[in-house]
Amino acid sequence: MKYTIEKITTLIGARRIGDTEAVVSWLLTDSRSLCFPEETLFFALRSGRNDGHNYIPELYRRGVRNFVVERGHFRLSDVTRVSDVTASTGTGGGLAGANILEVVSPLEALQRLAERHRDEFDVPIVGITGSNGKTMVKEWLYQLLSPYKIVTRSPKSYNSQIGVPLSVWLLGEQTEVGLFEAGISQPGEMQALRDIIQPSIGVLTSLGTAHQENFRSMDEKCQEKLSLFHDAKVVAYNSDDNVVSRCMRKSGYHGEKLSWSKEDPQAAMFIKKIERRNTVSTLYYIYKGKEGTYHWPSIDDASVECCIAAAVVAL
């Protein structure tokens, strides 16, 4: 989908410097990933080691004309009365013909724009979180669903405060299913990701010790991850995991709980047996009362667990 720069200015509540007409198809936070400069909107993000504002002159020289910046970085004269030399080189602060969108926080503006974009779609969206296995579950699900549906998914492991909005922006008019990862490292981070992804189906993978130093307990981390699914219609999880099962009970979640288990025959998917031969695993399962088998091209425990998570959602 394409947005005019005027509409984006309104959606993110920006103050616009410059009046060049433009259409935006691509969002950029890393100058090394530039592909289509004419239709790119660059968000100048700060990190502990870097400042995206420093790359604006270079991107201008490479053809980018639309930028989201922190307030106070540019003046009207930077995008209007500049010499021909400055305009052509992008040096000396000259950004002739550019659109500068000033906001308090470029990161929050990026997230808000992705959230507004997500609002345009009424299709099944699968949100995947957990300490381990998010990317593998997403990719297995993609392999299972893509022969039958047009699927939009997170690139690579794009599951951060920056990666999630960039992923959700990829939703297009042809999308029939979305698969998005969400990763957190400390309490309070999931709220923004939930607002962007707005999953209708949730998948909680295994929990581990990653980022545990930022949480008081494993239960606190589990509850933070489960908050992604506050409004989801269905949540799939491993009921054999005591922490996950306890958190699901405490979460107050009122949608459908789609559990899988190797121990509980009452689970939505009960794994009767797993056979491993050469490089293939065969799952013998009962799913909502119906028996079936599933063949998977891997035999290690972590891959098999991800396979089960993907299968319970795909079925």
Give the residues covered by each predicted segment.
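Phosphate-binding loop of NTP-binding sites
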Residues: 107-254, 315
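Adenine nucleotide phosphate-binding catalytic loops in nucleotide-utilizing enzymes
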Residues: 218-219, 256-315
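N-terminal leader/targeting and accessory segments in enzymes
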Residues: 1-110, 272, 299-302
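A generic structural signal for residues located within well-ordered alpha-helices
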Residues: 51, 224, 239, 302-309
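P-loop/Walker A phosphate-binding loop and immediately adjacent motor/lid segment at beta-alpha junctions
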Residues: 2, 251-260
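Conserved beta-strand scaffold positions in the cores of enzyme catalytic domains, especially
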Residues: 16, 81, 100-102, 125, ...
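Short, polar loop motifs at secondary-structure junctions
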Residues: 68-75, 239-243, 262-263
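A generic structural signal for short, well-ordered alpha-helical segments in conserved domains
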Residues: 9, 56, 138-142, 311
